[in-house]
Amino acid sequence: MKVRLLLAIAGLAIGFAVPSIAQDTMKVVTVDELVWKEHPVFKGAQTVILVGDPTKAETIVQRVKFPPHFKVPPHTHPYSEVVTVLSGTYWNAMGDDLEKGVMLKPGSVFVLPANHTHHTWTTDEEVILQIYFTGPGGITFINPADDPRKKAQ
């Protein structure tokens, strides 16, 4: 009886742990099929959504391409995210101190907790990131005047 109960609990735990990307058929996206679009927030950056809809509460896998010498001011996200640097050298700093940061080379991974202030930048080369999070997406700039969406209006 105890074994059955433990197996049932373990089965439920595994079921709840399966990401929301589960589907009936395999999905393959080759690099040649990627259609990069203008990033909705950062003019000059590009993005492609590989999995999910960032307006919905589901698993999202997104790539973002930043040009050289690009800066993202201090901001937060309402979700935690796992970021992998695919190419280029990327800088990330926690908090709003613009002098401190960690250099991340291709293959580096960093995890950002929800609602933690951070800012990022590139130096002399283009950077491509892959970002994994659970939507809906969102960004809040610490200084509202830094929000590029407001500057575009």
For each of these PLM feature ranges, what is it?
Residues I60-H77, G101-K105, P113-N115:
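Conserved short histidine dyad/triad with adjacent acidic residue
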Residues D53-T55, Y90, G95-N115:
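Short acidic-glycine-tyrosine-enriched beta hairpin
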Residues M1-L5:
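Positively charged n-region of N-terminal signal peptides that target proteins for export
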Residues V41-F42, P54-E58, P73-T84:
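His-enriched metal-coordination microenvironments in redox/metal-binding proteins
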Residues I21-I60, A145-Q153:
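A short, N-terminal "cap"/entry segment at the start of jelly-roll beta-barrel domains
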Residues L7-A17:
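Bacterial N-terminal signal peptides
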Residues P67-F70, H77-D97:
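Glycine- and acidic-residue-biased ligand/ion/polar-headgroup-sensing regions
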Residues T25-K27, H119-Q153:
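Double-stranded beta-helix
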